[in-house]
Amino acid sequence: MTSGSPARAALIALDWGTSSLRAYRLDGAGRTLDTRHLPWGIMRLPQPLQDGAATASTQSGFELAFEQACGDWLRAEPALPVIACGMVGSAQGWQEAAYLDVPVDLPRIGTLLTRIDRAGATPVHIVPGLIQRHGLPNVMRGEETQVFGVLFDQAGGGADDVLIGLPGTHSKWVTARRGRVTHFDTFMTGEVYAALRGHTILGRTMSEAP
């Protein structure tokens, strides 16, 4: 899916997860000018052809997916910075971006991006995920950018402590204080429900969502 605007952009942002790739062309105020949604998650990448046959080069697969997502944007505006978040920075991704330990000040994330150099082409910078080592070990990749957005919107609102709910297959509840992530928990409710619905006798009694 794509939508478009000829307005001048300031940034390309990628939300690159396990099952899909979302690309956003943003202006200087953070407004969305263009969006694209492709089925190329890190576990399902396009395969380059070599002598008419598909090859198994993972790096080439990432390059192909990246080109489909925003190659024309960069040809039109080659100086645009590109920032990516999500599982693209995992050990199975394009390049691993080290986790930052919680508690952490969110502005610090922007100073520790992992750079992917692309043979003279526009580099890609990957946002680090967060890891919580105390208590039950916990990690996140991609959700930290959503937390950043919530806290940015809350700036000046007078609330010191914020509890943020992030629904999904692996839902998260994040506690933040004055721009600092102090704790988060992950719940596998969505995945457990999907497993029950698809692989147990209980699933036969579950109706479709309205």
Regions found by a protein language model. Name each.
Residues 52-77:
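Conserved active-site "lid/cap" helical segment
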Residues 2-6, 75, 117-119, 153-158, ...:
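Solvent-exposed alpha-helices and their adjacent loops that cap or buttress functional pockets
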Residues 17-22, 38, 87-91, 166-172:
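Gly/Ser/Thr-rich loops at beta-strand to alpha-helix junctions
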Residues 71-137:
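Short beta-strand-loop/turn "lid" adjacent to the catalytic site in phosphate-handling enzymes
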Residues 27-31, 120, 175-180:
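Short acidic-glycine loop/turn motifs at beta-strand connectors
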Residues 11-15, 81-83, 162-166:
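Short glycine-aspartate micro-motif
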Residues 11-60:
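Short glycine-rich, Thr/Ser-proximal phosphate-binding strand/loop in the N-terminal lobe
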Residues 43-45, 131-158, 162-163, 167-210:
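Glycine-rich phosphate-binding loop plus the immediately following alpha-helix
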